[in-house]
């Protein structure tokens, strides 16, 4: 099921005699002259926002994955193309997959800015929970939210423009925004958006992938003429994402990790992968660091899904050497066992449940929310 939510500010936007445009550089994209059509109301909403005199920062979530980084980059470029003074930032360092694809495609990642002052204007991409926001977000002024998750504690009703679609990647939504607003996607922006799309859908193979993702994939791959390379690029991205060489077990646990506040509980959820022949040892290592991770991140409960990979039985697909074959869902903290077992059944051993289902974190989070709330 796919849900699309558009919340639009209705404040005499269509009867304004004067249009206020904030000056800034528009070097990144060429804007097509606005015309009547589906994007007209969208443009009117943007024109009516309280942009203020300072830079509006566009942030993905903390511990950013590729989609978080690239959706913030892509949307900041779009806003600048329309004349709004926006700049992408990251609130914590990028992961190895983002580092790889940025080097491969030759784009710069946003600068690190770990906190913002009260009143700072923000646009959020790829998250909808304060626990995942840049520090200071509660006292900031959130102008927009572009996301593909269920509504978190940053409520849609308090934000002037919200676009939330239950599809595979936030970068797909950003692609749609460019088209609706009539802004041409240059090749560098196409690479940025494709990066997030490939990562969050794993080249359209994840169960969360929707038709909209396929449409964006086809257009971006075609524009960049990557039809013969995209499978290899995706494979190399996956290898970079799962490269834990030189990392401590605690660092591995939080390499793809998100915080949530649900039902009065502070929750942390990691997302990891391991080979089937290494699963027992890997699961035990992750269990061993959970007490410290819970303490360091000030959580009440801690979970992680660990996807188990097996050799691809399709010998003719060299770009997909491994495929997922179930997942372990591990837990720690008071009440965590009851939550995990309510979703996945009895524990295999203390701290460990298992399912043959292919589930993303995005699909597991609503199940936890339902139990706790």
PLM-predicted stretches and their roles:
Residues 25-30:
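Bacterial lipoprotein signal-peptidase II cleavage site
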Residues 20-23:
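C-terminal motif of bacterial Sec signal peptides marking the signal peptidase cleavage site
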């Amino acid at each position: 099921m796919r849900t699309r939510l558009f919340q639009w500010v209705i404040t005499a936007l269509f009867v304004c005699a004067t249009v206020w445009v904030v000056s800034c550089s528009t070097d990144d994209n060429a804007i097509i002259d606005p015309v009547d059509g589906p994007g007209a109301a969208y443009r009117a909403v943007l024109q009516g926002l309280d942009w203020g005199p300072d830079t509006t920062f566009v942030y993905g979530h903390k511990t950013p994955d590729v989609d978080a980084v690239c959706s913030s980059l892509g949307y900041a470029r779009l806003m600048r193309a329309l004349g709004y003074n926006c700049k992408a930032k990251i609130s914590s360092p990028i992961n190895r997959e983002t580092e790889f694809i940025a080097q491969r495609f030759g784009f710069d990642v946003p600068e690190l800015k770990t906190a913002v002052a009260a009143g700072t204007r923000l646009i959020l991409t790829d998250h909808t929970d304060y626990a995942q926001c840049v520090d200071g977000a509660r006292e900031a002024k959130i102008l927009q939210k572009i996301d593909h998750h269920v509504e978190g504690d940053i409520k849609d009703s308090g934000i002037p423009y919200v676009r939330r679609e239950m599809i595979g990647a936030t970068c797909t939504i950003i692609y749609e925004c460019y088209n609706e607003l009539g802004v041409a996607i240059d090749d560098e922006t196409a690479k940025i958006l494709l990066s997030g799309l490939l990562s969050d859908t794993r080249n359209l193979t994840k169960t969360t992938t929707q038709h909209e993702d396929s449409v964006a994939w086809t257009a971006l791959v075609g524009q960049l003429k990557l039809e013969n390379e995209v499978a290899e690029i995706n494979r190399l991205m996956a290898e970079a994402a799962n490269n834990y060489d030189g990392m401590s077990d605690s660092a591995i646990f939080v390499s793809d990790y998100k915080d949530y506040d649900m039902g009065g509980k502070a929750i942390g959820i990691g997302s990891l992968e391991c080979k089937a022949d290494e699963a027992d040892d890997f699961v035990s290592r992750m269990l061993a660091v959970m007490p410290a991770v819970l303490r360091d991140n000030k959580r009440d409960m801690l979970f992680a899904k660990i996807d188990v990979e097996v050799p691809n039985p399709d010998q003719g697909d060299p770009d997909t050497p491994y495929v997922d074959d179930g997942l372990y869902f591990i837990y720690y903290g008071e009440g965590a066992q009851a939550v995990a077992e309510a979703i996945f059944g009895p524990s295999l051993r203390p701290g460990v449940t298992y399912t043959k289902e292919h589930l993303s974190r995005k699909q597991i989070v609503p199940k936890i929310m339902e139990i706790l709330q």
